[in-house]
Amino acid sequence: MPRHQSYSLSDEDIIELVFRNYGVKITPEQIARAYAPEQRMSWKKSVEVARFIKGMTLKQAKTWLEDVVKLKRPVPIKTFKKKQAHHATPWEGWPVAKWPVKVARRFLQVLENLENNARFRGLDVDRVVIVHAAAHKGFKIPNIMPRAFGRATRFDEQTVNVELVAVELPKEVLPKRYKLNLVKR
């Protein structure tokens, strides 16, 4: 990780978050992290994917994102859905869903890193749950596009910093099957 960047949550914050959400006390040795700085992908789609995989086990998140890459299952869109196609027959209750293939591939790489970090720390990978997933804006790469009559238009390529934190939980509180939070309209 670059020196100028740090994780957004400390170990104490993660321990408090897990106790608040799952009612389980953990130690800092049960925490695994993964960080991917300056990934060239869409920030908006990254936020949606990060929100979606939060609360899943590692295996659930990996299988879902692999299905997104194969275009079998979409990712539901909650925030950035203005001027998007709303389907007449909603997908499992979500009228707006997308297949962000490039973002899913990058998140699969970060999940692979997270799984290796969990194994290195001696955690049981089957009981590891993603408790924090964040996608922050990175720096912008300036580009120039030539236009007609000698003009030029500047456009910036965006980058995203992806951060995942996972915790080993007891079997009693593991999510059995991932359920979508359906929105009642």
Swiss-Prot record:
Domain of life: Archaea
GO annotation, biological process: cytoplasmic translation
GO molecular function: rRNA binding; structural constituent of ribosome
Keywords recorded for this protein, A-Z: Ribonucleoprotein, Ribosomal protein, RNA-binding, rRNA-binding
Annotated family: Belongs to the universal ribosomal protein uL22 family.
Role summary: This protein binds specifically to 23S rRNA. It makes multiple contacts with different domains of the 23S rRNA in the assembled 50S subunit and ribosome. The globular domain of the protein is located near the polypeptide exit tunnel on the outside of the subunit, while an extended beta-hairpin is found that lines the wall of the exit tunnel in the center of the 70S ribosome.
Subunit (UniProt): Part of the 50S ribosomal subunit.
Name of the protein described by the UniProt record: Large ribosomal subunit protein uL22
Organism lineage string: Archaea, Thermoproteota, Thermoprotei, Thermoproteales, Thermoproteaceae
